[in-house]
């Protein structure tokens, strides 16, 4: 029985260590959720906050992203935040929208004609530092940037590149989307993460400038806004975003989701979404996690993050079980050792009383160095 307990304890300890290592690895596996870590360059802490907008009759537009951007800028000015390096940015943001299109035409420079290049594409209009938040792996070429003058450049994912041109070496080639000509800036791949692969749209993806959506006659409804903001105290960054929507009730001790329930948007603090308190909260709400009261079509990176959350919660529950088993085994072994002890508290106390009371009393009768006082113990 003793050997079995030792084996079970060792197994539990090893399992707990392995699960902790796996959880640490999984929590860092999504680059889309770790922008704050990449952005932080000094002692100042940062938090990544995302806003997901509903698809309603009165949708949010690019102007709403600009308003939120202005709110954050003003709040950081009020807080007197300054970049550690002169000329550097103190914070960063990005916004995006995803639309489906039925067809795209490829431009053949040799003949000067256009021809169909497949159908059913997903088009992502992106603004700000989108590819800093979502660093897709480049296969060829470069990303597109908000600061560039030409907004008719695009990044294709590998499936879109192959469907259009049957090649990945296509930088500089052109295609036509809803009558507007675009030039290929680069080809990118979403990566090998399992959850990203499952959540990624089945239709080939084209990334274009957000400002080009309206020119191409596409829906400009805002889907997602993201920002990495200084977070010197808990909930500071999130509170700034909430204030933009008229809510200013966040404190360090308040439940994160309570103020959000008053809004038609969903606000997520990506930075600590896999922390122990959030995982514990996720387990307590596991039954209701599939229930949604908002008409929001999440982008693939958020769906992947939510799938990863489920994985993390299962790993966390397994780690709790291993830790509990190890604790029970250790406590039971301590109890066994105590019950089988060869010493008793009563004997210990009697010895201490004899040492510090009787010897103290008899020391008054000691008359020489060789006299220990033992004789006086029997003197009448």
Can you say where each PLM-predicted feature lies in the sequence?
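Hydrophobic secretory-pathway targeting helix
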Residues: 1-37
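Membrane-proximal extracellular/periplasmic loop immediately following the first transmembrane helix
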Residues: 25-102
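Extracytoplasmic
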Residues: 44-46, 118, 148-151, 170, ...
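Solvent-exposed, non-transmembrane alpha-helical starts
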Residues: 58-67, 116-120, 150-152, 192-204, ...
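The feature marks short, hydrophobic/small-residue-biased sequence motifs that occur predominantly
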Residues: 92-144, 148
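Mid-to-C-terminal secondary-structure elements
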Residues: 129-138, 156-244, 250-300
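N-terminal membrane-entry
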Residues: 303-325
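Juxtamembrane interface at the cytosolic side of transmembrane helices
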Residues: 322-373
């Amino acid at each position: 029985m003793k050997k079995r307990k030792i084996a079970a304890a060792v197994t539990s300890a090893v399992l707990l260590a392995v699960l902790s290592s796996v959880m640490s690895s999984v929590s860092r596996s999504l680059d889309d959720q770790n922008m704050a870590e990449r952005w932080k360059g000094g002692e100042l802490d940062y938090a990544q906050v995302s806003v997901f907008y509903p698809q309603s009759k009165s949708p949010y537009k690019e102007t709403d992203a600009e308003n939120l951007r202005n709110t954050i800028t003003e709040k950081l000015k009020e807080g007197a935040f300054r970049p550690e390096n002169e000329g550097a940015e103190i914070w960063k943001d990005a916004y995006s929208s995803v639309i489906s299109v039925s067809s795209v035409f490829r431009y053949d420079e040799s003949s000067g004609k256009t021809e169909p290049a497949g159908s059913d594409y997903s088009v992502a209009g992106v603004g700000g530092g989108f590819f800093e938040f979502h660093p897709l792996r480049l296969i060829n070429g470069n990303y597109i940037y908000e600061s560039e003058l030409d907004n008719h450049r695009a990044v294709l994912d590998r499936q879109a590149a192959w469907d259009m041109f049957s090649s990945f070496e296509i930088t500089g080639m052109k295609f036509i989307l809803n009558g507007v000509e675009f030039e290929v800036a680069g080809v990118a791949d979403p990566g090998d993460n399992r959850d990203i692969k499952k959540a990624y749209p089945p239709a080939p993806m084209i990334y274009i400038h957000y400002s080009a959506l309206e020119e191409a006659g596409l829906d400009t409804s805002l889907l997602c806004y993201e920002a990495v903001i200084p977070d010197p105290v808990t909930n500071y960054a999130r509170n700034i975003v909430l204030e933009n929507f008229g809510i200013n009730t966040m404190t360090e001790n308040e439940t994160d989701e309570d103020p959000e329930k008053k809004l038609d948007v969903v606000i997520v603090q990506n930075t600590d979404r896999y922390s122990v308190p959030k995982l514990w909260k996720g387990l307590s709400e596991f039954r209701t996690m599939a229930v949604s009261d908002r008409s929001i079509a999440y982008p693939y990176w958020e769906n992947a993050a939510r799938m990863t959350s489920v994985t993390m919660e299962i790993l966390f529950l397994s780690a709790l079980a291993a830790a509990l088993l190890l604790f029970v085994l250790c406590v039971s072994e301590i109890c066994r050792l105590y019950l089988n002890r060869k010493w008793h508290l009563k004997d210990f106390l009697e010895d201490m009383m004899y040492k510090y009371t009787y010897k103290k009393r008899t020391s008054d009768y000691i008359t020489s160095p060789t006299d220990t006082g033992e004789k006086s113990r029997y003197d009448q």
